[in-house]
Structures are given as C-alpha cells and as structure tokens.
Amino acid sequence: MTKKIKANYQAIQELGRLCSGLDVQSFPDNWETLKHCAINQLQIDSRKVGKDDLFIAVKGFEADGHAYLDQAARQGALATVVEVPQPNLDLPQIVVADSRAAVADLASQYYDHPSRQLQLCGITGSNGKTSTSLLYRQIIQAAGWPCGLIGTVAYEDGLSKVSSSMTTPDALDLQRYLRNMVQEGYEHAVMEVSSIGLHQNRVRQTHFAQAALINLSHEHLDYHGSMEAYFHEKSKLLKGLDEEGVAVLNADDPWSISLADQVSARVLRFGLSDQADVRAENLDLSTGFATFDLCIDPENFLASAKRTPKTAFNLNQLEAGSYPVKLQVPGLHSVYNSLAAITLVLCQGLTPEICAQAVASYGGVERRFQQVYNGDFRIFDDHFANTKNIDMTLKSLSEMDYQQLVMVYAIRGKRGPKVNRENIQTLNRWLPQLKMRAFIPSLSQDTVGHYDEVQPAEIAVFQEEMQNNNLPYTIYDELEAALDQALAQVQPGDIILLAGCQGMDAGARLILNKLAERDPAHREAILAPLQGRVCGW
C-alpha cells in the first residue's frame, strides 16, 4: 500500500490576494486598506458567519443571501461579496456579476487550488455515475492507492465520511474536501459531476485529469428545459479538459460519442461495438450477472488517435488480449459501468488484470438493479430514475431466466406529467415482452415526503398511458399494501421487481422485514442486504 504523505498547507487569507482572480465590478471605498486584511473563513450561510469571515451572498432557489447581509454584519463579517449592492449596509461590499462563480473562484484560491495536486477523475451522465465512480475507486484501491470520493452516496476525504446532501457539493465544500484529500496524502480522487452542479458553477476552477460522459437520457429537463441544454451542461466537463487530459466516451451512446471531435483532450471509447477501444465480447447475461471477455486492442487505440487530434495514451505497457470478467452485480448497465471505470483507470497505467479482478469483486450500489433477496423467488430493487434507466433494467430482465415477473411500481411524484408520461410509455414498450404475472402500481403515500407526493395530473397521465395495454392493475395508495399484494402473488422461480424513485426507497426495507417475519429462523440472513443502507430509513 502506498504510504500517505501529508502535505504542508496554509490557507490563503489576505483579502486582496483572495479576490485577485474575481471579475469585480466595484470595490468598497476603503479597499486600499481592506485588501491587506486577513479573513478568517469563507461563508455562504449567514448563520455560520463569525468574526472576520468573508460572506458571499448567493441567490438560491428558496433563499437569497442578499437578504441576510445585516445578519452577517452583526455577526462580525469583515466584508461581503454581492451581485446587487445594498444601500446603508454597515459592511464593505465587493460587487461581482455572478456570486456563484465568485464562490468557486474564492474557494479554489483560499484552499490553494487542491484539484491541481490530485489525479481527479470526473464522471457525468444520466445513469451509472455512482456505480462507475465506486468501481473506479475499487480498482484504484486494489492497486494500493488511496482514493477520495465525492458523490451521491457519500463524501470521503481521508478525514471523514459523511452522507451526501447533493451529488456535487457546493464549491466551498468541494474545495475543502479536495484540500483535505491532499492534506491526507491522497493522490487520486473520483467525483460524480451533475449537470446542475455544472450549471451552477460548483466545479468551476476544479482541474480534472480525466472525465467520462457515460450516457445521456431524459433527466432534469424540468431544470434545463431541453435535451440540448442538458447536453450542453454535461459537455462542459469534458470540453473543460486540457490537452493532457483524457476524455472517455461511450461508443454506443450517440450523445456521448458526439463529443469525440469537440474536446481538446485525448479520447478513449468504451462499449460493446467494434468502435470501442475497451469493449466487452462474448457477453452472457442469462443469469442476470454478466460474464464477458474484456478486450483491449492497442491498435484500436492508435486508430482512435487517427480519428482525433491527440494520441490516446502511452501504449508501451499495454498488450493486446482478452481477460475474462464475471460481475457480482446484475444488469447490462453494470457491464457499461465496468467498461467505463476500466477505461479510466487504464489511463493511470494499471494493468487489465488488476482491472478485471477488481470489478469482479465489486458488490454494487443500493437500488441500482440490486438483488436483495434470493430464495424460492428473487427480489431486485431499482430506482427507475429515467427512461434510459428503465430501458437498461428491463432489457437486463428480458435476458434473464425466470418464471414470471411481479412488478411493484412507484409512480413518480412531483416531477410533472411529462416525466411520468415518458416513464410509462417506456414501460409499456417492455411489458408485452416480459413474462408478467402482476403489475402493481402504488402512490407510496405511506413512505414519501411532501416533495415527492404524486399529484392528480401525474395519476391521470399514468392511467391514460396504461389504457394502451391490456394489463390489469389496481393503484394502491400505500406502498406497504402493494408489497403485500406482490408477496401474495409471487410463485417459486419468479422475480419481484421493486421499481421506482423516491416512492420505492423504502420498498426493500418493508418487504424484507415482511419476509423475515415469515421466517424468523433466517431473519439475520434475510435482512443482511439492509446493512449500511441509506435509502428508505
């Protein structure tokens, strides 16, 4: 194991130096004196402001930091950064055009640009970011290198592990986590990068050595407005790579591969097609758990170099060949996630053998087509986040051996009729191809919070679209009642699929506890998949 060597570090605190890179529209009248003062900490939450802190007023969706400038002044702030100067404020104001951009610029400067001292890998896409980032870290750690993590499940920086509140944290927290990693001697880190995080400048001033766009499908369109706008935000991550960086693209995804000639970085492709530089051949998904041959052809890398301005990477240590892989996580999507992670770590100089061994021992992420029960019948749990996710999950199911399928489906709440219509239309394309025993939809009123309650318009869209098939169903108000119905109908050899986003988060906990009550002698084994679980508690 590589020894972690802690770095020496002193926060940059002189206000003038901190603000040297800002796009400042106006400074306060006393700037010539103020710029030599030392600030204590940067703050974007007025409740945390202390003596000599610099408070940055950010306009959010629910609150505007400009409304709390008086509070920041009372609590001893040295100065504030604002977009809109406030009259009669007893606090020096540094006026900028974009406070969110200023937070990122200030945070990176304050923490002395920690991303430049790491091999930082950024992963974006509609589906699979979490799994791919964890696979990447597992391979890096298998080689004996500590690896920091920032993503949907947790933030791990060497000092602590905390549950995440956002996939991509705000810029101030992000730079602090990256600085902690450097301080703890980490040389590698992997980070999920969301489209919203990119749009809100959370990763501005963050240097990525490599990045991947693993796929793109309809997601967050309520925020971005269109697929084109969504893609524009996602593509920022890869277009921001410098010429020494590596852009990893999905050869089988049209949105991803379209970036091949739009980036300055070197390009590598993964997938199942012959165009992929790292690909899976002889793929078998009959059990649900993939086996395949990992194929890497150095000549294909050279072909990539001819198709793009830059050579992919140093080929001297890479030999042609195929390497058998058996995954412990189900689904076709797991194959793509594994290929993406492998392609990224090959850039670090790791051998294909280490990659194949590490991904074979990966246990998966909760609620990503996760097998939570394997008895007379099996139970899989999937978050059905969007149409691409639904397609991947049901395609994997269609290639598996089972008797019949019992699907418990949580209608998605407060995401609008359009999202629900697209989800049900995707479901309807698959339901005739699956061996359905029962389709059991639920509103999950007993488990969701206010922000995820299914609205009347969403129920109406669901019912309208379900008229297009002949599958009988009853909508259950409560998830627990829907799960009772699933257990009443399931037969040996069947699969129960727990399908849905927030409305199904509690599904595995509820159904496994019901099974444990039926079989108390095996209670511990039945409930084992819930250990360490975050969703649904």
For each predicted feature, which ranges?
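N-terminal leader/targeting and accessory segments in enzymes
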Residues: 1-105, 302-309, 330, 517, ...
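ATP-dependent carboxylate-amine ligase
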Residues: 1-27, 51-54, 121, 306-308, ...
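Phosphate-binding loop of NTP-binding sites
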Residues: 16-22, 102-251, 255-263, 342, ...
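Residue-level signal for inorganic ion chemistry
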Residues: 53, 72, 106, 123, ...
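Short glycine-rich anion-binding loops that position phosphate/pyrophosphate groups of nucleotides
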Residues: 60-62, 195-196, 218-219, 253-254, ...
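Generic hydrophobic/aromatic pocket-lining and core-packing "Φ" positions
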Residues: 69, 137, 178, 234, ...
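Non-catalytic positions within long, well-ordered alpha-helices that form the structural scaffold/packing
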Residues: 69-74, 182, 398, 432
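Acidic, Mg2+-coordinating active-site environments of NTP-dependent enzymes
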Residues: 86-90, 210-379, 402, 460-465, ...
